[in-house]
Amino acid sequence: MSRAGCIMVQGTMSGAGKSLLCAALCRIFAQDGYKTAPFKSQNMALNSFVTRDGLEMGRAQVVQAQAAGVEPDVRMNPILLKPSSDVGSQVIVNGEVRGDMPAKEYFRRKKSLIPDILRAYDSLAEEFDIIVIEGAGSPAEINLKADDIVNMGLAKRVDAPVLLAGDIDRGGVFAQLYGTVALLEPDERARICGLIINKFRGDVEILRPGLAMLEEKTQLPVLGVVPYLRVDIEDEDSLAPRLQSKSAVKPLDAAVLRLPHISNFTDFMPLEQHPLLGVRYVQSVREMGAPDLVILPGTKNTVNDLLWLRQSGLEAAVLKLAAGGTPVLGVCGGYQLLGETLDDSQGTESGHPQTLRGLGLLPTRTVFTAEKRRAQVTATAAAPFAGAALTGYEIHTGRTAVNGAPFCRYADGTPEGCVQNAVFGTYLHGLFDSGELTEQLAAYLCRRKGIAPETAAPLAMADYRTQQLDLLADGVRSALDMDAVYAAMGLHNPRGGKI
């Protein structure tokens, strides 16, 4: 069996656009008839996903798999780091939790993970025509080059040609690209098959002199200037501009608390697409205002974020709004926060034994344990959203005892979550993706506010995502020299060049 061709996208810095460029290439190659898989050896992210077989992986590779039209597979992201503090992360290997590690300990041990990475890659390479590999940060972080497993170190091990991308939108792209190339070793520079200027706004002709000089100084071709593409595709963690607080410009205002350890905030992307719902992220009492809905999102550290809510005054603000009848929704860690007590007597969540009072808005009690529940589920919402079909996944530590009405029922009849008055809690991530709950939530908020709801067919997130991925692929295909990209992999371009 022939081994897959491959191409790797590295960047001059975090946020250079590697994830979306990889998603675009996955889409392009799939459109061209190649069976394609994404791969990132090590991803650091708070947004994660549970696969069909109950394993955990980063959402960036999930989006890339969706772009390629294939089922997300944990082999596409064998190492996932989920920050649990400023100096440590939960380490997930092949979808299973290995434990929490300080950064120094992880860097000492990461070389031992190379066999896991290569087994995952080699397995994919036997099944697919093309592997699109995403690097992390910059390959020129000279303090991190020893035992590198995610940039040039990986490229050497799998013999991958490299596209190096720089973000012109933040300025200094020529220095970024030239400096990165200059700091690489000769054999590493030889792996770069081309440079990409990413996120350009304006007339590309203005760039021509700079591009020519960059090619002369680096002795590398610029394979494309990718425009700033206004596509709405799930993005990674705190670099995401959607986390910046913004005023609601729609009839309904939803305020999502921007917790210090916020995770899986991609849950709320479908709400942003609704014509009546404005979504903003707040991290202070001053920003809170008088929303129509308060959302407590998932968090990687429920206990520490509860303490932050208390210290920031946001707990008191949420309680005041709830007492006045403002609906409150908690998802996963946010659901735990809404309960009466959070029992971390084993110290598995916060690092030392303690039991804390929750916000007390739901009749629930959560006990944290080391065991993590991971499962894809289907469910039907209960009142006041009765009948809405839900699909999503659970991914959490802790077990919650409920003394109240459920938020939904799983397909086997098992009750899940809790509802009390206008306060709702659920462990279900992705609950708005099907569109039905979004419509029912909007109608519910309209009734409470006394405004007329808009009637429209529910927007399925999968359909919207497909549309956005096609827009992304079209924009990148038209900007890149695809003949050169295919040639670097030793493959034929079915479309015969740029379009």
Describe each PLM feature range.
Residues 335-336, 432:
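Short active-site segment of divalent metal-dependent hydrolases/proteases
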Residues 1-320, 327, 344, 370-371, ...:
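Flexible phosphate-sensing "switch/lid" loops adjacent to ATP/NTP-binding sites
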Residues 339-347:
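Extracellular/periplasmic helix-exit of transmembrane alpha-helices
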Residues 332:
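Catalytic nucleophile serine of serine hydrolases
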Residues 348-375:
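Conserved P-loop NTPase catalytic core
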Residues 190-192, 340, 356:
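Core-facing hydrophobic residues within beta-strands of well-ordered domains
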